[in-house]
Amino acid sequence: MDDAEGTMTGSFDGIDIAVGRMLVSSTSQAAEMVNKVLEYHDEKSYGRWRNNFVIYSDDADNSTDATLQVGLNDLADVLTTQKPFVNVKKIHTDAYVQQVAAGGERYPEAKKDFLDALQLGALVFNYFGHGNEEFLARERLFEKLEAQNLTNRYRYPLFVTITCEFTRFDDPNRFTGGEYMYWNKAGGAIGLIATTRQIGVSTGFTMNNLLTEDLYAYGSTNYPTIAEALRLTKIATGSDNRRVVFYIGDPALKLAIPKPKVVLTKINDVP
């Protein structure tokens, strides 16, 4: 660079370039991830699943956790108001019966509904709650092994996880559930917007709402790339905690939001 070309000046603390990380470690794995992007645009991927949006919330173990469900529910309601073509499925774990097994508390019916929804397909899955590298929530609402075994080919969602370390990709000695969700070559996700470290509830709320607004371009039909939506969200979020949120996937990819092309030409065979 020329002298002083890399000097940081001014007070701008935002992001200039939309970034996406395609996490691969070999040419064969890179080819598999590129192939998923091609399949995402293939005619075989067309279907009503692209109108679906699924929310999945952790249960309320304390008063703070209760706000996770309320906030995620409100997010979904605003989305359907802004974009009426979106069909929202709400999976709130506290709406299900909790069972206690030898390994701890579980929500088998909520988990089944979530896995079934993944197989049927949705454009976006949005989870808000606790999590670690191995699973979502202490009730194991979604586990690493399940991410590896998904078979939802041609129905790849964007997986949004506002949690802790479910997609902590900077430890080469420990692969996470989020990474396996992305690496699944015939299932899993087309990309993830995910946290790599713990995120505060307040920042999580703010980013989740802004992200959905940016992804679905409220008030417009000019939809941005997923990476650009996250860039706009990060700029609009004041907290430094926003830095733990990353986009895993093709930075040039847009959500496959259906474009209505119905043209009325005749009524009862009369032009």
Where are each of the predicted segments found?
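Cysteine-dependent hydrolase recognition
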Residues: M1-P271
